[in-house]
């Protein structure tokens, strides 16, 4: 559960509606793979991940980024039940994919960075704080199965 004020909820909802979510997802996942190269081990089937330009242009990275951001978007619709919303994905990433749960936090930070880049001056410190709460809640929900 994420505790947002009414103003924070309005900020998150309003700003989220201004971005192309698919682009945010693709760029955030790409940045994760570039900035934290050890995360690439989970994506060995994605082909060429040899350089930043290869990663950012990789169609499989873009497609998976879209999938990731669609799940994030679902979370935005269920902020009061993130654990329930992400229960299946938490189980999948824990039991089958064996993803280090710290990566969820790192990806959340990449989403915030990309939002800041795309929204510019509209992404105020208060907006960033609201989105940080959301991505922290999503990361916690995704890591729930690990506890």
From Swiss-Prot:
Signal sequence segment: none
Membrane-crossing residue ranges in chain numbering: none
This protein's record includes keyword Iron: yes
Asymmetric dimethylarginine: residues bearing it: 105
PTM annotation (Phosphoserine): residues: 13, 51, 53, 126
GO biological process: carbon dioxide transport; cellular oxidant detoxification; hydrogen peroxide catabolic process; nitric oxide transport; oxygen transport
The entry's keywords: Acetylation, Heme, Iron, Metal-binding, Methylation, Oxygen transport, Phosphoprotein, Transport
Entries under CDD domains matching the protein: Hb-beta-like
Mutagenesis or variant effect for residue 21 to P: In strain: Sprague-Dawley
Lineage: superkingdom: Eukaryota
Gene3D superfamilies, per the entry: Globins
Heme listed as a keyword: yes
Tissues expressing this chain: Red blood cells.
GO CC, any one term: hemoglobin complex
Entry-annotated residues carrying Phosphothreonine: 124
GO MF annotation: an example: oxygen carrier activity
Positions where N-acetylvaline occurs in the chain: 2
InterPro entries: Globin, Globin-like_sf, Globin/Proto, Hemoglobin_b, Hemoglobin_oxygen_transport
Domain named Globin: residues: 3-147
Binding site for heme b: 64, 93
Short name of any one Pfam family annotated for the protein: Globin
Post-translational modification N6-succinyllysine, affected residues: 18
Family, similarity comment: Belongs to the globin family.
Functional note: Involved in oxygen transport from the lung to the various peripheral tissues.
Subunit structure of this chain's protein: Heterotetramer of two alpha chains and two beta chains.
Name of this protein: Hemoglobin subunit beta-2
Organism: Rattus norvegicus
The organism's taxonomic lineage, starting at the top: Eukaryota, Metazoa, Chordata, Craniata, Vertebrata
């Amino acid at each position: 559960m994420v505790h947002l004020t009414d103003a924070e909820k309005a900020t998150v909802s309003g700003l989220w509606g201004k971005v192309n979510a698919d682009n945010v997802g693709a760029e955030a996942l790409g940045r994760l793979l570039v900035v934290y190269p050890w995360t690439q081990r989970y994506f060995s089937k994605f082909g060429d991940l040899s350089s930043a330009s290869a990663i950012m242009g990789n169609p499989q990275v873009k497609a998976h980024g879209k999938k990731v951001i669609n799940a994030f978007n679902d979370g935005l619709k269920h902020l009061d039940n993130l654990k329930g919303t992400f229960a299946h994905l938490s189980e999948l990433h824990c039991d089958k994919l064996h993803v280090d749960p710290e990566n969820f936090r790192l990806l959340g930070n990449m989403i915030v960075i990309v939002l800041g880049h795309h929204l510019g001056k509209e992404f105020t410190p208060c907006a960033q704080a609201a989105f940080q709460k959301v991505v922290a809640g999503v990361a916690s929900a995704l890591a729930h199965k690990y506890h």
